[in-house]
Amino acid sequence: FSMCEHHMLPFWGKVHIAYIPKGKVLGLSKLARVAEMYARRLQVQERLTRQIASAIERSIQPLGVAVVVDCCHMCMVMRG
C-alpha cells in the first residue's frame, strides 16, 4: 500500500509490470522491490506508475516497458 499525499490516507492495489528485455533480465523480486520502494513514499497513483516505469527504463534499458497500477483509494471510499 501507499499513502495519498493529498489526504494522508492509504491506497492499495496491484502493480502489473511488463517489459521486453534487451540483454538484461530482472527477477520477479527485483520488480517487486522497485514497486515497493516507490510505494513507501507519499504518492499519487499517476506518479507512482511513472516512477516505476522510469526506474526500469533507466536500469536495464529494455526495448519497451509497461506499468499498470490498479488501486483502491480510501479517500474515495470514505466519501461514499
UniProtKB/Swiss-Prot annotation:
Keyword S-adenosyl-L-methionine annotated:
no
| One Pfam family it belongs to | GTP_cyclohydroI
Control of this protein's activity is summarized as:
GTP shows a positive allosteric effect, and tetrahydrobiopterin inhibits the enzyme activity.
Among the GO molecular function terms of this UniProt record, one is:
GTP cyclohydrolase I activity
Q: Which domain of life is it from?
A: Eukaryota
One GO term of the cellular component aspect? cytoplasm
Q: Which reaction does it catalyse?
A: GTP + H2O = 7,8-dihydroneopterin 3'-triphosphate + formate + H(+)
Chain sites annotated for binding Zn(2+)? 4, 7, 75
Gene Ontology terms describing biological process = tetrahydrobiopterin biosynthetic process; tetrahydrofolate biosynthetic process
Residues passing through the membrane, by range: none
Q: What is its EC number?
A: 3.5.4.16
Q: Which PROSITE patterns match?
A: GTP_CYCLOHYDROL_1_2
The answer on whether this UniProt entry bears the keyword Zinc reads yes
Q: Which UniProt keywords apply?
A: Allosteric enzyme, GTP-binding, Hydrolase, Metal-binding, Nucleotide-binding, Tetrahydrobiopterin biosynthesis, Zinc
List the pathway annotation: Cofactor biosynthesis; 7,8-dihydroneopterin triphosphate biosynthesis; 7,8-dihydroneopterin triphosphate from GTP: step 1/1
Q: Which EC class is the enzyme in?
A: hydrolase
Matching entries from PANTHER family are given as:
GTP CYCLOHYDROLASE 1, GTP CYCLOHYDROLASE I
Give the family this protein belongs to, as stated in its UniProt record.
Belongs to the GTP cyclohydrolase I family.
| Oligomer and partners | Toroid-shaped homodecamer, composed of two pentamers of five dimers.
Protein name as annotated: GTP cyclohydrolase 1
Q: Which organism is it from?
A: Euglena gracilis
